[in-house]
Amino acid sequence: MSNIRPLHDRVVIRRVEEETKTAGGILLPGSAAEKPSQGEVIAVGNGQITDNGVRALDVKVGDKVLFGTYAGTTVKVNGEELLIMKESDILAVLEG
């Protein structure tokens, strides 16, 4: 686990590796495979600051989420590649 605390309405996500094979069973080289667009939330900020105070985030640590291919900023912390993005960049939470 990385020691990182995002600010405000930002979350830190660890990408979940997706299968690098096509439906036909062809193995894709790393350069041809798209970066995964799902991951696990590993840290959340305190919330979005609004005129009415602070609004807590809807996602929590451990949630599996979907996000756009180009969402967030990639950072390297302790040798681990992580994504930092605003909660609004998260498209959905995977349940079940």
UniProtKB/Swiss-Prot annotation:
Keyword check for tRNA-binding: no
Coiled coil: none
Primary localization class, coarse: cytoplasm
The keyword Amino-acid biosynthesis appears for this protein: no
Entry GO MF terms: ATP binding; metal ion binding; protein folding chaperone; protein-folding chaperone binding; unfolded protein binding
Location of this chain's protein in the cell: Cytoplasm
PROSITE patterns, per database record: CHAPERONINS_CPN10 (PS00681)
GO BP term, example: chaperone cofactor-dependent protein refolding
Assembly with partners or alone: Heptamer of 7 subunits arranged in a ring. Interacts with the chaperonin GroEL.
Family per similarity comment: Belongs to the GroES chaperonin family.
Function field: Together with the chaperonin GroEL, plays an essential role in assisting protein folding. The GroEL-GroES system forms a nano-cage that allows encapsulation of the non-native substrate proteins and provides a physical environment optimized to promote and accelerate protein folding. GroES binds to the apical surface of the GroEL ring, thereby capping the opening of the GroEL channel.
Name recorded for this polypeptide: Co-chaperonin GroES
